[in-house]
């Protein structure tokens, strides 16, 4: 029997009898299973209408989860230049607040402003703005990347001693 994520998914749907057929037809990953439709279920051999309905509903839920998670990713691309100059003063607020929170929106991000619609679409940040946002978040959370456990200092004396003995150690090999 196949023991993978698709088997576990089908077992959760109480349809583990189709696991082998899924894998045999190339549906061995949930990413691939998100593309399943009626013709695919015919090829897999899912003939019972109740089973087909359960699988198609689960596929729909997988797609919804994937769409909801899409807002969590970002890319480092320059923002397109607006066609007309938009000058709008947005007071600096706390970054990283979820949509609909009581805090004011982030600078230049109209999604975080009060009254703005809460959307989960992909947002691109300029590289410099993203660096500033990350730096501010680290400072706010009290994280110092130059201190343990995030970094480990190598003693300089050890490096100098190694370099001074380097010609000797290379002759031994």
Swiss-Prot record:
Keywords, ordered alphabetically: Cytoplasm
Main location: cytoplasm
Record domain SAM: where: 1-65
Stored InterPro entries: SAM, SAM-SH3_domain_protein, SAM/pointed_sf
SMART domains recorded: SAM
Stretches the record annotates as Disordered: 89-120
UniProt cross-references to PANTHER family, sorted A to Z: SAM-DOMAIN, SH3 AND NUCLEAR LOCALIZATION SIGNALS PROTEIN RELATED (PTHR12301), STERILE ALPHA MOTIF DOMAIN-CONTAINING PROTEIN 5 (PTHR12301:SF8)
Localisation per UniProt entry: Cytoplasm
Effect the entry attributes to changing residue 27 to F: Abolishes binding to EPHA5 SAM domain
Entry's Gene Ontology cellular component terms: cytoplasm
The protein's assembly and partners: Interacts promiscuously (via SAM domain) with EPHA5, EPHA6, EPHA7, EPHA8, EPHB1, EPHB2, EPHB3 and EPHB4 (via SAM domain) (in vitro).
Record's note on what induces expression: Strongly induced in EPCAM-positive liver cells in response to liver damage caused by long-term 3,5-diethoxycarbonyl-1,4-dihydro-collidine (DDC) feeding.
Name assigned to this protein: Sterile alpha motif domain-containing protein 5
Gene name, Swiss-Prot/TrEMBL: Samd5
Tissue expression summary: Detected in kidney glomeruli, and in peribiliary gland (PBG) cells at the hepatic hilum (at protein level). Detected in liver, kidney and small intestine.
CDD domains: SAM_Samd5
């Amino acid at each position: 029997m196949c023991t993978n994520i698709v088997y576990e998914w089908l077992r959760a749907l109480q349809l583990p009898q189709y696991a082998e057929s899924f894998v045999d037809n190339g549906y061995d990953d949930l990413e691939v299973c998100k593309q399943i439709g009626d013709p695919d279920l015919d090829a897999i051999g899912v003939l019972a209408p109740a089973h087909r309905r359960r699988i198609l509903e689960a596929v729909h839920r997988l797609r919804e989860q994937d769409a909801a998670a899409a807002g969590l990713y970002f890319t480092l691309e320059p923002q397109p230049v607006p066609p007309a100059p938009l000058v709008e003063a947005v007071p600096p607020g706390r970054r990283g607040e979820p949509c609909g929170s009581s805090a004011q929106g982030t600078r230049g991000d109209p999604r975080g402003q009060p009254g703005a619609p809460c959307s989960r679409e992909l947002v691109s940040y300029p590289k410099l703005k993203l660096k500033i946002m990350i730096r501010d978040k680290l400072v706010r959370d009290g994280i110092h990347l130059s201190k343990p456990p995030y970094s480990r200092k190598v003693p300089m004396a050890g490096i100098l001693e190694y370099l001074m003995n380097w010609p000797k150690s290379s002759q031994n090999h």
